[in-house]
Amino acid sequence: MTAMNYESVKAVESQAAAGVTFRVARMSFGRRVELMRRVRELARQIEFLEAGQGTGDKMDAALLRAEMDRLFLKWGLLAVSGLELDGAEATPESLAEAGPEELFREALAAVRAEIGLNPEERKNC
């Protein structure tokens, strides 16, 4: 009998930039609990602000959604290979701070796909 070999990290090749690979954490029970703890308060604040009528509330909600995107990326993107930013090997943090937005969005989509959010849940997170 052969033992099951489960890889907790998934390699995702970039479609936007040849040679760039994202290493994305696969979902597990423990990681899901950790993520829910991190996201819970931000999600509440976003829901409250989106219910408001003012432009300021909408802008604040958009800012919190961007913060949530950054949180998802830092939680699920473990490494980036094949990309240098300002002469140094890219990291998840440097991709979020100074990398091309197209690659940030692509890495974020890979993380969200691994989280398993459906389209309605993705809209709210």
Label each region the model flagged.
Residues 20-125:
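Short, surface-exposed, charged amphipathic helix/loop patches that serve as local interaction elements
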